[in-house]
C-alpha cells in the first residue's frame, strides 16, 4: 500500500511505525 513519510499523522492513518529511513521519527502514513 502506498504511503507517505511524515513526522505525524492520525493514528488510524499510520501504516508502519517507521518509514525504513535512517530517521525513525518519520512514520509511514496512509495517503489520502
From Swiss-Prot:
Q: Which BP terms in the Gene Ontology apply to this protein?
A: defense response to bacterium
**Disulfide bond sites:** 3-29, 5-19, 9-28
The places in or outside the cell where this protein is found are: Secreted
Give the UniProt keywords, A-Z.
Antibiotic, Antimicrobial, Defensin, Disulfide bond, Secreted
The record's Pfam families line, in alphabetical order, gives: Defensin_RK-1 (PF17860)
Q: Does the keyword Disulfide bond apply?
A: yes
Which GO cellular component terms, listed alphabetically, does the Swiss-Prot or TrEMBL entry include?
A: extracellular region
Record-stated family = Belongs to the alpha-defensin family.
Instruction: Name the job this protein performs.
Output: Has antimicrobial activity against E.coli and activates ion channel activity.
Name of protein? Corticostatin-related peptide RK-1
What is the phylogenetic placement of the source species in the record?
A: Eukaryota, Metazoa, Chordata, Craniata, Vertebrata
